[in-house]
Amino acid sequence: MGLRTLVVGCGHMGSSHARAYRAMPEFEIVGLVSRGATSRRQLNGELGGRYPEFSHFEDALAQTEPDAVCISTYTETHAEYATTALAAGAHVFLEKPVADTNEGCAQVIATARDAKRALVVGYILQVHPAWQKFTEIARGLGRPLVMRMNLNQQSAGPVWDTHRQLLRSTSPIVDCGVHYVDVMCRMTGARPVQVNGVAARLSDQIGPEQTNYGHLQVVFDDGSVGWYEAGWGPMMSETAFFVKDVIGPRGAVSIAADRAADRGRSADLDAHTMTEALRVHHAELRPDGTFARQDEIMRVEDEPSHDELCRREQQVFFDAINGRVDLEAHWTSAADSLRIVLAADQSAREGRTVYLR
């Protein structure tokens, strides 16, 4: 029998994680939780309709007494749900970001440490083989690095509805940015010291204080710099919406995802993690000033689907529960990436540079 697992949140991410749990003998689903009945009934039906359903997290936690809890809910609930589950003795898989404040993030991590329970944060790109290779090559380009990344989503219908719901508690550069800022931190291995952010409200269908477009710039203490851009909504352009590019003194590496960057795919969940190929450029010159080496195209053979990536995340979770993952390093990475994106939000609101200690 696998670890008794409570799935909290039955949207896109929660459903993918639930499918992973059903397929893995290491886990056994003991309940599905969502505030609205529609999503959990739909997911339960897909999974065979045999799991208990709950509309309230606390009731589900008390009744099922799970070994593990998977939390894929809106950001404002993350800290409360995670600390409650950890305090109850459960291991926790928590979708990013850890919390909507740095203080909340610190509280969640401290609770996991005190409870001696595994806390794994859902940074899906960390388990993607091509993104692992992308990061490895970038580390070999010398210092400083220039890291250029974005993910704009031209969303309509139900996807735009989901984005507007998300905007009630977070911004695009926080919700999506933590993934790519985490990658930047792992590429440089350096400490972030300075953040600038700008943001814009491009729709009357969102709240007056909400913004659905944002751009951040981060400076590291080794001189590396990075920018990240994210926007959601039917107005978003699909021109250059998928930029993943790193430059260093020795050359450059880029994700050359032609199909993922096709028009009409910017809001496609599978396209967000697609790589297809890496283009490696070498800066070395011959004595006559011409390039010594041609660019290399490295085709990606292992291109996991979104559901497969979620399964790999759950394998990491299982390994962490069994003491095979350095969780202190994982928690530091999660906290650092959140600090950067929250600083970008603050910078955009206050119109000033934010310096990180």
Where are the language model's segments positioned?
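C-terminal helix-rich "cap/oligomerization" subdomain common to oxidoreductases
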Residues: M1, F27, A68-I71, D302-P304, ...
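Beta-loop-alpha module in the N-terminal Rossmann-like domain of NAD(P)-dependent dehydrogenases
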Residues: H17, G49-T111, L309
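Hydrophobic residues in well-ordered beta-strands that form the structural core
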Residues: I71, L94-E95, L119-V121, I255
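Rossmann-fold dehydrogenase core element
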Residues: Q107-I124, G142-M149
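Contiguous beta-strand/loop segments that form the cofactor/metal-binding neighborhood of enzyme cores
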Residues: V181-D270, R311-G323
